[in-house]
From Swiss-Prot:
SUPFAM superfamilies to which the protein is assigned, alphabetical: Aldolase (SSF51569)
Gene, per the UniProt record: tal
Keyword terms: Cytoplasm, Pentose shunt, Schiff base, Transferase
Official protein name in the record: Probable transaldolase
A GO MF label: transaldolase activity
Catalytic reaction annotation: D-sedoheptulose 7-phosphate + D-glyceraldehyde 3-phosphate = D-erythrose 4-phosphate + beta-D-fructose 6-phosphate
Top-rank EC class of the record's enzyme: transferase
Any GO BP annotation: pentose-phosphate shunt
Cited function: Transaldolase is important for the balance of metabolites in the pentose-phosphate pathway.
Protein location: Cytoplasm
Main localization of the protein described in the UniProt heading: cytoplasm
EC number: 2.2.1.2
């Protein structure tokens, strides 16, 4: 399973790359606004430049989201985003207009990511429209007492049944269990916040064992110095 990092932070992207855990990046306007702080001084050209800088760090796909809801405007913006860097994938919301944009962009050879997907119906439409990727938001479904990972399993089954080439990006990941369940189900990709990537490496028994090893190593060192 591939690991994408879900962030717009250049520092986090570089850190994930240094760990060998970076197969791609997903961003959205909210993530970019979070790192910018004062959005009033951040122009659309600044946004494009930030996407370019992300793509220069990442060796894989970088999903950049359109900022409009009209099909024609999404197509126009998507073409401009794709021109920033060869790694850019255009994220479009799963709406009727979004499907139109996905179809048009896909037919032009531009990779697309159908985002804000919350049902198997939407995922089926994304694949039919030619989306390169589909992003089911599991954490947000969990938030409303719906089993988000059940949706991932449904999508994988549908795609396997018909041989769709659309890759499943498990998104809105909140904790390591989401990542492990994604891997067990056979999802293509999990897009993970950097904080969760760090959590994947943690286990209390590892900490306890390491503490004991270090204590014993210190004793051995004292004995060898004696």
């Amino acid at each position: 399973m591939k690991f994408f990092i879900d962030t717009a932070s250049l520092e986090e992207i570089q850190a994930a790359k240094d760990l060998g855990m970076l197969d791609g990046v997903t961003t959205n306007p909210s993530l970019i606004a979070r790192i910018v702080g004062d959005a009033s001084s951040f122009s659309y050209q600044d946004f494009r430049e930030h996407i370019r800088r992300i793509a220069e760090i990442a060796d894989g796909p970088v999903s950049a989201e359109v900022t409009t809801t009209d099909a024609e405007e999404m197509i126009h913006e998507g073409e401009a985003l794709a021109a920033i860097h060869e790694n850019v994938v255009v994220k479009c919301p799963l709406t009727i207009d979004g499907l139109k944009a996905i179809r048009h962009l896909s037919e032009k050879g531009i990779r697309t990511n159908a985002t804000l997907v919350f049902s198997p119906n939407q995922a089926l439409l994304a694949a039919k429209a030619g989306a390169s990727y589909v992003s089911p938001f599991v954490g947000r479904l969990d938030d409303i007492s719906t089993e988000g990972m059940a949706l991932v399993e449904q999508i994988i089954t549908i795609y396997d049944n018909y041989g769709y080439l659309t890759e499943v990006i498990v998104a809105s990941i909140r904790h390591p269990r989401h990542v492990v369940e994604s891997a067990m189900m056979g999802a293509d990709i999990a897009t993970i916040p950097f904080s969760v990537i760090r959590q994947l490496a943690n286990h209390p028994l590892t900490d306890a064992g390491l503490k004991k090893f270090m204590e014993d190593a210190a004793i051995l060192k004292k004995e060898s110095d004696a």
